[in-house]
Amino acid sequence: MRAVGGVASDDQGNATVLGAFAIAALAAVLIMVIYVGAAVLARHRAQAAADLSALAAAADHVAGESDPCAAARTLAATQRPPAEVVSCRIDGEDVLVSVRVPVDLGRFGMRSAGASARAGPVG
């Protein structure tokens, strides 16, 4: 290479460094997409567990069971991953259930996704 004004003008390796930074940025974006996807999946699982638990509790409540929330807790615990019933209350003929599902976000730690559902007779 020729020197311009006494300074070497060597550009070899410049694209390698730029390529390495581009790959690192792409990897970081991909990792964030995976974590966001895990959080969204946990939220959907929590909603499914809340819906099913509320339906089970409402069916027991309409049938005259003494503790319809026990059915909600039992059903939530059988989900994959197991959901925890945070609250279960009777509101007239309806049952309101809130659950949470754990989600592992790697370096961001363990978090939980929550959801609520209401179920009861129609009409």
Identify the role of each PLM range.
Residues 54-103, 118:
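Short amphipathic secondary-structure patches
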Residues 3, 105-123:
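Low-complexity, S/T/G/P-rich flexible repeat/linker segments used as non-globular hinges
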Residues 32, 96-111:
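Short, structured secondary-structure boundary patches
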Residues 1-69:
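Alpha-helical assembly-interface signal, strongest on the long, hydrophobic N-terminal helix that forms
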